């Protein structure tokens, strides 16, 4: 396996951190944006302890602020090193909160970090991906995007309506512009947006005859033992509920994946062999029995498979983050 230059968002904790360590140990060159200097320093210390710091850069890039995303991309473009794999993995959830939180530009924070910042970064970095001989994009989604799955059925289902919230712009609490704020639905919607964005990207790349696989995946329910990772925001809001949920899911029912195993799946998607050399694909780590998960190619939800909706989302999101819809795509 030859060495790749891999950029991973959300690599300072959880699955992203696990994947980063495994990829660094395998000899890949990594760029791991961190939202603060404190985060970057902590990540540097952790990697140094494991002798993994040599091939890793940790630039500042706060996904909750589009100006910071723009600065990060500008720095990387200036350095000019091709990106072989772009992993859009950061995923914020603040379950249990009754009020929305807002990004620096006034967008609801879950959507801002999980979707808008990722599209902004992706479009700006496309020239560096297209400069790689074998580029790929990997997007971490979630089964909760699909109302027919066990996780997607709990609470309000994902659904972006006609994207009225994006048409309203900053200050809209939900993407559909209709439903009252619900933190869990906001997360599900953001994961649906991840899949729609990936689908729109794959369609545009095909139109421009660029060969680049767009690999989307769902890690399954990953529950770490400790305070880091995906559940850290939810734990602050509902500590007892989270503790009971964790005990049930991880220790009694064994329906959850370990961060190390989920990290290995992500590392494989980022640097392993690809089944197809271009186009959209979706794989899900699905529960087939207690303690047994199977990682397999699946179809995302009907809504996530709507090409017209994907194209609309791409165009609206591009304009919200201050880009032309074809920015980065018309690069030869």
Where are these regions (language model features)?
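Short alpha-helical oligomerization interface
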Residues: 96-112
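NAD(P)H-dependent oxidoreductase Rossmann-fold/reductase module
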Residues: 1-84, 91-93, 152, 174-332
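Active-site beta-alpha turn of Rossmann-fold NAD(P)-dependent dehydrogenases/reductases
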Residues: 90, 138-141, 173
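A short helix-coil junction within the Rossmann-fold of NAD(P)-dependent oxidoreductases
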Residues: 78-80, 97-98, 124-133, 204-207
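Active-site loop of short-chain dehydrogenase/reductase
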Residues: 82, 129-166, 209-213
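Helix N-cap/beta-alpha junction loops of NAD(P)-dependent oxidoreductase domains
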Residues: 93-98, 146
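A short, exposed helix-loop element centered on a Lys and neighboring polar residues
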Residues: 122-123, 199
């Amino acid at each position: 396996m030859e060495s790749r230059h891999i950029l991973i968002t959300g690599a300072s904790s959880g699955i992203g951190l696990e994947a980063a360590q495994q990829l660094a140990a395998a000899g890949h060159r990594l760029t791991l944006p961190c939202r603060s200097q404190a985060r970057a320093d902590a990540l540097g210390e952790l990697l140094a302890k494991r002798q993994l710091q040599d091939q890793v850069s940790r630039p500042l890039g706060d996904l909750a602020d589009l100006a910071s995303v723009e600065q990060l991309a500008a720095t990387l473009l200036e350095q000019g090193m091709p990106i072989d794999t772009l992993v859009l993995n950061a995923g914020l959830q603040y379950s249990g909160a009754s009020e929305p939180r807002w990004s620096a530009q006034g967008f609801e924070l879950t959507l801002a970090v999980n979707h808008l910042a990722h599209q902004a970064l992706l479009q700006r970095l496309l020239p560096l991906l297209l400069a790689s001989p074998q580029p790929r994009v990997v997007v971490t989604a979630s089964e909760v995007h699909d109302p027919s799955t066990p996780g997607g059925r709990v609470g309000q289902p994902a659904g972006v309506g006609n994207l009225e919230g994006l048409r309203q712009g900053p200050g809209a609490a939900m993407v559909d512009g209709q439903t009252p704020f619900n933190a869990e639905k906001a997360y599900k919607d953001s994961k649906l947006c991840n899949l729609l964005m990936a689908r729109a990207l794959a369609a545009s790349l095909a139109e421009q005859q660029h060969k680049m696989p767009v690999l989307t995946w769902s890690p399954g329910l990953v529950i770490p033992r400790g305070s880091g990772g995906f559940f850290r925001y939810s734990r602050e809001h509902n500590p007892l509920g989270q503790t009971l949920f964790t005990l049930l899911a991880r220790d009694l029912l064994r329906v959850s994946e370990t961060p190390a195993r989920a990290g290995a799946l992500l590392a494989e998607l980022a640097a392993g062999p690809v089944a197809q050399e271009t186009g959209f694909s979706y794989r899900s780590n699905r529960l087939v029995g207690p303690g047994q998960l199977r990682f397999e190619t699946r179809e995302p939800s009907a809504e996530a498979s709507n090409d017209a909706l994907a194209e609309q989302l791409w165009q609206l999101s591009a304009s919200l983050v201050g880009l032309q819809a074809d920015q980065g795509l018309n690069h030869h």
